């Protein structure tokens, strides 16, 4: 497993946790951490489908922040696991608003990495009056070019990993690799969807870090959530118009933001972070020279904690 960066705050347990039924199908897990009178912050995990980790609570000073975290529909402890029906970006945004209302929060800092950065931007552009600012990492704008890179661009860096991912798919289906995996992942036969889920999760997980890490134990929860929901969202363009997040950036451009990006991120390459900052001159782009995609890589974790420390002191990122 990756070494825990020294810059993180000590492990902490939730002060409250529970389940919230958001429709007739989905129930989402939530937790609250830190000071109930602190600065409200919303943590958005990646994937989609990756779910929460106890480490996610540790980017924030628990004496200064009131941290709200939740497993998005179909992820982690939310039920049903891997459920893609009634699961869209707009519905996730609605869930965030349900949580904000439930907790009685007027405005909050929004913190998200990878797919979490996508959802953070989409939420902010839908509800700018509810946001204090943004801490974003590993930017994914969910454009068609980024989706194509995720599936095919990696072969320039990890050709053996790409070949392993493609190998189970018959030759006549390889012209639409995303469609081929989605058909397998979203079917009802566990003998079909489990191997596909594990292959998808390996394909992504083995390129998260710049430097190789010891293999972690496989998690069925992670594999099924990530495989099903990433393929579902990518097949639908993230339920966004192409480049919508850049187009609508004016709605949040007045708010403070910091972007922490690994220079050698081969899942969400730096071009997207660069494009976002160019369109958002007030945002601070902090390129980490010796990191890939992982939030727990030392330089990225340090950058994220630095950002939350700056915001608690000044309400901005300088």
Regions found by a protein language model. Give the residues of each.
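Catalytic active-site module of serine/aspartate enzymes centered on a nucleophile-bearing elbow/loop
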Residues: 283-318
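A catalytic-pocket lid/entrance helix-loop region that shapes and gates access to the active site
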Residues: 131-181
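Short beta-strand/loop motif that positions the catalytic acidic residue
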Residues: 252-253, 259-261
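The serine-hydrolase catalytic nucleophile loop
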Residues: 48-61
């Amino acid at each position: 497993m990756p070494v825990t960066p020294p810059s993180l705050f000590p492990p902490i347990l939730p002060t409250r946790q529970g389940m919230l039924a958001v429709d007739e199908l989905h129930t989402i897990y939530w937790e609250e951490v830190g000071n109930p009178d602190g600065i409200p912050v919303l943590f958005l995990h990646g994937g989609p489908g990756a779910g929460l980790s106890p480490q996610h609570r540790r980017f924030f000073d628990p004496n200064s922040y009131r941290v709200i975290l939740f497993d998005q529909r179909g992820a982690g402890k939310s039920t049903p696991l891997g459920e893609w029906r009634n699961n869209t970006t707009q519905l996730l945004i609605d869930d965030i608003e349900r949580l904000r209302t439930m907790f009685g929060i007027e405005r909050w800092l929004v913190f998200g990495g990878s797919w979490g950065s996508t959802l953070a931007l989409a939420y902010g552009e839908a509800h700018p009056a509810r946001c204090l600012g943004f801490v974003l990492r590993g930017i994914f704008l969910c454009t068609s070019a980024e989706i194509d890179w995720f599936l095919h661009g990696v072969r320039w860096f990890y050709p053996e990993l790409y070949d392993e991912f493609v190998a189970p798919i018959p030759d006549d289906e390889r012209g639409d690799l995303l469609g081929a995996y989605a058909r397998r992942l979203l079917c009802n036969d566990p003998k079909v969807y489990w191997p596909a889920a594990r292959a998808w999760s390996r394909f992504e997980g083995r390129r998260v870090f710049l430097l190789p890490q010891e293999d972690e134990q496989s998690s069925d929860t992670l594999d099924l959530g990530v495989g099903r929901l990433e393929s579902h969202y990518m097949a639908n363009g993230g339920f966004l118009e192409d480049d919508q997040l850049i187009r609508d950036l004016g709605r949040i451009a007045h708010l403070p933001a910091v972007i922490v990006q690994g220079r050698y991120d081969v899942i969400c390459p730096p071009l997207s972070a660069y494009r976002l900052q160019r369109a958002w001159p007030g945002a601070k782009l902090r390129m980490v020279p010796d990191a890939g995609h992982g939030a727990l890589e030392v330089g990225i974790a340090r950058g994220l904690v630095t950002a939350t420390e700056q915001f608690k002191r000044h309400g901005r990122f300088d």
